[in-house]
Amino acid sequence: MKITIYFFLLLLSFTINSVSATVQKFNFFDLNKQLNIFLKKEYPLNEDSIKIIIHTPLKKNIYCRKPDFSILSNTHNLGLINILLTCSKQHYYLTVEVQSEGEYIVANRKIPRGTRIKESDLKILIGRLDVLPNNTYRKKKDVVNRISLREFFPLQPITSFMTRPFWLVKVNQQVTVIINGNNFKMSSKAKSLSNGAQNQNIRVKTNSGKIINGIINENGEVIVSP
């Protein structure tokens, strides 16, 4: 009888240990899985390939039924980021590396400062996005017709800090203002108070001294709607 009880207790202990190990392994695996899901929502890079590397080892005995993640930064840059993991009342600080590969825009040739950029000036490369400068352009259409603020060298990644819009309207320029009202349309001349690109809002001063706001159309006219 004692032998039977001994073997029963031994078997029960083995079963409990096995279940405990399985639960720990599952929870650790689930935590990594949940972190990947969270980061891929935070970095919606569409077709880009994303790889996540956790530099802070997670303890395998962490049990977290509903993990809550938050990025400890206002910017969503790629590369190394710090994440706060909250499990019930416990807090864990993680260092995570977000690597991504996708298309980005570089100069196809040497582009002088002040150039209105054409599509032929640009080239698409595929590579690591997390090692590029912040705000590197990803689409040609976002760069075409913009003005280079500095000289670009061949294969140099182009960022939003290196270009400005092409001004259809310049400060102090006489422009045509078109006012669209209910069942009427009228036009007059006014002086622009700033530079402006297509579809941008701009303030102009009429000949009577009144300051109004409007949207610049493709012809450089300022459209005022009620």
UniProtKB/Swiss-Prot annotation:
Name by which UniProt lists this protein: Flagella basal body P-ring formation protein FlgA
Claim: S-adenosyl-L-methionine is one of the keywords in the record: no
InterPro entries: Flag_basal_body_FlgA_C, Flagellar_FlgA, SAF
Pfam families noted in UniProt: ChapFlgA
Gene designation per UniProt: flgA
Role summary: Involved in the assembly process of the P-ring formation. It may associate with FlgF on the rod constituting a structure essential for the P-ring assembly or may act as a modulator protein for the P-ring assembly.
SMART domains: SAF (SM00858)
Native source species: Buchnera aphidicola subsp. Acyrthosiphon pisum (strain APS)
Localization: Periplasm
CC annotations in GO: periplasmic space
Keywords carried by this UniProt record: Bacterial flagellum biogenesis, Periplasm, Signal
Superkingdom, taxonomy of origin: Bacteria
Signal peptide: 1-21
Alphabetized CDD domains for the sequence: SAF_CpaB_FlgA_like
Main location: periplasm
GO terms, biological process: bacterial-type flagellum assembly
Family membership noted in the UniProt record: Belongs to the FlgA family.
